[in-house]
Amino acid sequence: MTETKDLLQDEEFLKIRRLNSAEANKRHSVTYDNVILPQESMEVSPRSSTTSLVEPVESTEGVESTEAERVAGKQEQEEEYPVDAHMQKYLSHLKSKSRSRFHRKDASKYVSFFGDVSFDPRPTLLDSAINVPFQTTFKGPVLEKQLKNLQLTKTKTKATVKTTVKTTEKTDKADAPPGEKLESNFSGIYVFAWMFLGWIAIRCCTDYYASYGSAWNKLEIVQYMTTDLFTIAMLDLAMFLCTFFVVFVHWLVKKRIINWKWTGFVAVSIFELAFIPVTFPIYVYYFDFNWVTRIFLFLHSVVFVMKSHSFAFYNGYLWDIKQELEYSSKQLQKYKESLSPETREILQKSCDFCLFELNYQTKDNDFPNNISCSNFFMFCLFPVLVYQINYPRTSRIRWRYVLEKVCAIIGTIFLMMVTAQFFMHPVAMRCIQFHNTPTFGGWIPATQEWFHLLFDMIPGFTVLYMLTFYMIWDALLNCVAELTRFADRYFYGDWWNCVSFEEFSRIWNVPVHKFLLRHVYHSSMGALHLSKSQATLFTFFLSAVFHEMAMFAIFRRVRGYLFMFQLSQFVWTALSNTKFLRARPQLSNVVFSFGVCSGPSIIMTLYLTL
């Protein structure tokens, strides 16, 4: 089957229009029928193939023979390597993909779709910097010993070597000799900080016991944490089991019952788009859950959707790659002698890239053997949101380390409950009273009271914010990683040293950042053809929407405060990139730390009072 095209609509043949001269012997129309398009023609002008009639226009003399020779030459080349319409469209598709598949500077190097996210055996930050040194190399104070050794070295040097010191010129250099550095271990401060928080919690508990006795079950936070546990567990289990729908879809594709490109893709997309809208009203409105339960179920449902999406579209991409490999290989074998050298090269590159992509993570080519309920279940257990066939694993489970993290989880939850009950709950009740008093004696007293509430909220909420971060991203994720022998423990970076919120958004929650990088940022650039700046804006916008939904799950009302604060990070990023702040990283870190300590408290106070 050949593709027909009116050459008069192609830029290559625009000069032919001048053949229709207004002089004698003019031609009223020039029509070409049944033209076999070469590959170059499809790439330059991929318009629909039709036969048309063009009105005669003015032309110059002497052009007819030149254009006729060119057309004849092209027709001879096309007849030598005929390509059908479907193949022509397929080749055009491959050429459009080549820009993202090959390195810009070296066309022989492939660029994998999976190269944006990597997993390597890495320890978590607090373990490598504090916990491990404290348990393995801690020997008490070391600074005094270093000073004594340094003094002893200087004394021996003076006794053996005579030196001349010039003191006539002043200098600003430090007195310490170059290469000599004093080091100390700060593990003791880490222990002291936890001891300090523990004694505060014990003091609060003893004060409550002296006033109310052993009626611990009457505490509001305790009631929040201990009610409807069975219902919550069953609902969470039901949502988890629903995510196996994506495994069922890919199993159907594996058995060639359906095709991923159309049926599978649409089915998974509908499932993901409907998952949160269907489950959200159940735990927010249908069940009379407290706000702690609502936010837990919402965040867990988002995790389920993210894991399902990563599993589904990772394997969906490999289905497309596998199908491309089969088709390109088939065409190379079928038309081995009749294809042009350029077409043969395109198809061969397609086969090479597909093999490279299928073997990118493992030489065993486990796809599609990885599509199973057990594989998806194991992925759901891993403390990661981006799916791939293989992950770095440890050789064994360190049960002492697991016990340490379990104790850290229990102890941190206890500290969080004490902080929430005795430091935040009274302020929250005052905020609700403020919200229920519309006038509050005028706007000036109301403003003063609002700032008073904010200042009371900041200390307790900042402590709760830090404890929540430690409990989830260090204690909980490391405990799960150890139980599953997941070797990459890089769940967060040193975000406390950030000088901009742009850095903070990347390293404070590495699992979510990796998911957004692959499945939102890069996918939006590929599927929606967005630029880098547009993809960045789209990623932040989507993240802000889910943050606002989390606030709705807690307060059951839409205010948009957190949504606006999320998007305001663009402003803070622009300010941190100014020449003034870039030259002063210490000041930038102070500004960042002020925002981290005050921002969450401002948002919480706004939602409670306004």
From Swiss-Prot:
Topology in the lipid bilayer: Multi-pass membrane protein
Keywords: Acyltransferase, Endoplasmic reticulum, Membrane, Phosphoprotein, Transferase, Transmembrane, Transmembrane helix
InterPro entries: MBOAT_fam, Oat_ACAT_DAG_ARE
BP terms from Gene Ontology: ergosterol metabolic process; sterol metabolic process
Catalysed reactions, as listed in the record: lanosterol + an acyl-CoA = lanosteryl ester + CoA
EC number(s) on file: 2.3.1.-
Compartments (UniProt record): Endoplasmic reticulum membrane
Family membership noted in the UniProt record: Belongs to the membrane-bound acyltransferase family. Sterol o-acyltransferase subfamily.
Protein name per the record: Sterol O-acyltransferase 1
Gene name of this polypeptide: ARE1
